[in-house]
């Protein structure tokens, strides 16, 4: 089976999803589903490949899913932090990128500044995967799309409501959804909107795909007839000093609770990228309830990233 070679995606970076088109993204999702269904078929396709993983931020899902993923495809992983590399002592990113390109086949980096990832990709001769930055979290968006596809057997025309902070997760979800034709409703208070440049790019993608984007401060309006309701923490890593203000600004109005979800479709599903703060952005009743698919969603990080690795590393 050569499904992973359908598009010429070998060597491509995954920085913000904008490097990819709708067909390529859809193929990644379908390949991920195939890998989940029949993992043994793909167990040696990346034999001899080495993935370097650099972490500047703590990680559970990103680290374990990428490390397990490359191993399950027959490859290997080397896990590092910037503190363990010369880059942590002032070596230019340019030098690190060129040297790492001599040793390994791809780099996944989880860091703070998106500019750092872009600079690494500019100088590297190997694919760079963004494992999370302050602006984007594309690998999470791949898992989100896969989860939606598994439940609906399609992406176009699905209605998704995102309630909360216009953060990196929201940015990538917005771009991915717009690219594949999902109707996205965003609800967030003033001061927590998505980046204007990213929103403009998403709106352009939606015009091409037939998707719709609607932005409001009213979460009840956003969830009306929604197929999926998505939220994330109100305070991300590095924003701990703002926690009290953020809790006050979001308040009960933006909490995903029984009253809010009553406006969605009866068979709606709840999504959260995790980790979650129960009784803040979502009640335990909802996140632990029958409509929640958060563990399936988290599990799909593994399969979506395996498909991504196969696509960019010239799988055998």
From Swiss-Prot:
* Gene Ontology terms for molecular function: amino acid binding; ornithine carbamoyltransferase activity
Hey, which pathway is this one from? Amino-acid biosynthesis; L-arginine biosynthesis; L-arginine from L-ornithine and carbamoyl phosphate: step 1/3
User: Per the record's keyword annotation, is Glycoprotein included, yes or no?
Assistant: no
Tell me the PROSITE patterns matching this sequence: CARBAMOYLTRANSFERASE (PS00097)
Per the record, the domain of life is Bacteria
EC assignment: 2.1.3.3
Gene Ontology biological process terms in this record: arginine biosynthetic process via ornithine; citrulline biosynthetic process; L-arginine biosynthetic process
Q: Which Gene3D superfamilies match?
A: Aspartate/ornithine carbamoyltransferase
Gene Ontology CC annotations of this record = cytoplasm
| Positions annotated to bind L-ornithine | 168, 232, 236-237
Catalyzed reactions per annotation? carbamoyl phosphate + L-ornithine = L-citrulline + phosphate + H(+)
Specify which residues bind carbamoyl phosphate according to the UniProt entry for this protein. 59-62, 86, 110, 137-140, 273-274, 301
What does the sequence similarity comment in the record state about its family?
Belongs to the aspartate/ornithine carbamoyltransferase superfamily. OTCase family.
Q: What's this protein's name?
A: Ornithine carbamoyltransferase
Which species expresses this protein natively? Listeria monocytogenes serotype 4b (strain F2365)
